[in-house]
């Protein structure tokens, strides 16, 4: 209580992680994309993959887009989020099954930003880490997410029931959460794979096809390490050398 006076009196014990931290996920993503661009990556936005095929004669992959464009590659990295199973299952007999799991958040005004000074987690359950209450790098307060399994892989809308659940569950940790200071709300989809874990690496029966699938929480924290690991795998596969 000395560290977090706003915590509920019903809290019996806590685990403090002094090395934990926060980032802005939007700015982090943009920064990584900028770094990729500097290193030669070319982005193709709004370019859906229609089909994948492997040419055994030269080991190359052929990618056909929904617009009819084609690409040829020696390796493919499958980081397609909730659609990663659909791409993987085109090329591998070991099937993946990804369920979109919606999480809804509420963002509170900076007037509530000092209510807590750490990211407050509840005990995790089978659907994830539960509702958290966290400061943001911009001085706001973030509450969420919910966890709702869906069939629609584009359902990123918020719901009245979901947002009510965010505030109700958040107040189990911090009873004084001021819902009237909510300035916006949003939702996203985690890619929850049936096996319950990340799927990272080269598909055994699809040489040159590398999965980064089923990356749900703590995917943001894991992303830099996953990126470095997969880069090493691909570099080894291509016998590539470091750039000067």
Regions found by a protein language model. Name each.
Residues 31, 128, 137-138, 149, ...:
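C-terminal catalytic lobe of FAD-dependent flavoproteins
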Residues 21-24, 70-72, 218-220:
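Short, surface-exposed beta-strand/loop "edge" segments at domain boundaries and coil↔beta transitions
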Residues 13-14, 75, 140-141, 208-210:
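Structural motif
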Residues 1-45, 50-59, 64, 178, ...:
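Flavin (FAD/FMN) cofactor-binding and adjacent substrate-gating region
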Residues 44, 77, 210-212:
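Hydrophobic/aromatic beta-strand patches that form the interior of the parallel beta-sheet core
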Residues 52-161, 168, 174-177:
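Flavin-dependent oxidoreductases
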């Amino acid at each position: 209580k000395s560290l977090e006076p706003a915590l509920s009196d019903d809290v019996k014990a806590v685990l403090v992680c002094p090395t934990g931290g926060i980032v802005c996920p939007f700015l982090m993503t943009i920064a990584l994309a900028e770094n990729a661009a500097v290193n030669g990556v070319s982005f193709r936005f709004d370019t859906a993959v229609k089909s994948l095929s492997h040419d055994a004669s030269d080991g190359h992959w052929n990618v056909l887009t929904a617009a009819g464009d084609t690409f040829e590659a020696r390796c493919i990295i499958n980081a397609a989020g909730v659609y990663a199973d659909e791409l993987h299952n085109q090329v591998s007999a070991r099937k993946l099954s990804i369920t979109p799991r919606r999480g809804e958040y509420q963002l509170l005004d900076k007037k509530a930003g000092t209510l807590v000074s750490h990211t407050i987690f509840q005990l995790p359950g089978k659907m994830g880490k539960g509702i958290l209450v966290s400061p943001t790098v911009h001085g706001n307060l973030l509450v969420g997410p919910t966890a709702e399994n869906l069939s629609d892989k584009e359902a990123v809308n918020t719901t009245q029931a979901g947002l009510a659940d965010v505030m109700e569950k958040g107040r189990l940790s911090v009873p004084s959460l001021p819902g009237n200071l909510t300035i916006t709300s949003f939702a996203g989809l985690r890619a929850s794979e049936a096996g319950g874990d990340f799927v990272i690496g080269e598909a055994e029966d699809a040489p040159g096809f590398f999965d980064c699938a089923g990356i749900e929480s703590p995917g943001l924290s894991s992303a830099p390490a996953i990126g470095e690991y997969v880069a090493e795998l691909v570099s080894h596969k291509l016998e590539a050398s470091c750039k000067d």
